[in-house]
């Protein structure tokens, strides 16, 4: 199996390095390539770089960095910039959760989404903290060992979130749906050294829907959550309402 690894924290980030070394040391008879941003590009979502050139830097040992977004990285990695055609894409391990509404902003999930767009089964994995990357690596490894039994095709993305706890404390894996966060906190305002007003985006909101069956609930209770995602934002329930409304309007 040929696996393309990417992330949004950058190619040197501890999460992607932990997963890279775990997979290499355990030798799953897989061919690996790592292509990730040259710096932290968290919350880049599905953005592509269109107005400036992209450059790939070869760091040896099949590790590459790109002066672009996570989506750029996967796009280049699959679409002809490298002599490598992966069987699947894995994005992560992210330092921090990607649950609920986070998936709309997440560069980690976006890298997996690009893999899906380009016809590859894709997985995004995040650690809900920044300490126990070995726990998330082990969860990912167990999935790889059983991948031949996993009915994952290119229309589905698996979004995995792992509690930041030792592996022996993990209770198991739950299949979940996305929860929901409250709105983000207000922006943080301050001044730069020259006295100019500057702003920082506020923290993500707390969980609003963390009921049983959600990713929030699973992680809070010591389980890794696995949420299957699809890319269809259509609000089907509203279609009939809008049809009825527009039928009575003259254009």
From Swiss-Prot:
Keyword Ligase: no
Catalytic activity: a ribonucleoside 5'-phosphate + H2O = a ribonucleoside + phosphate
EC number: 3.1.3.5
UniProt xrefs under InterPro entries: SurE, SurE-like_Pase/nucleotidase, SurE-like_sf
Cofactor(s) for this UniProt protein: a divalent metal cation
EC top class, as a word: hydrolase
Cofactor binding comment, as recorded: Binds 1 divalent metal cation per subunit.
An example molecular function term from Gene Ontology annotations: 3'-nucleotidase activity
Subcellular location: Cytoplasm
Positions bound to a divalent metal cation: 8-9, 42, 94
UniProt record similarity statement: Belongs to the SurE nucleotidase family.
Function statement: Nucleotidase that shows phosphatase activity on nucleoside 5'-monophosphates.
Name of this protein: 5'-nucleotidase SurE
Species in which this protein is naturally found: Hydrogenovibrio crunogenus (strain DSM 25203 / XCL-2) (Thiomicrospira crunogena)
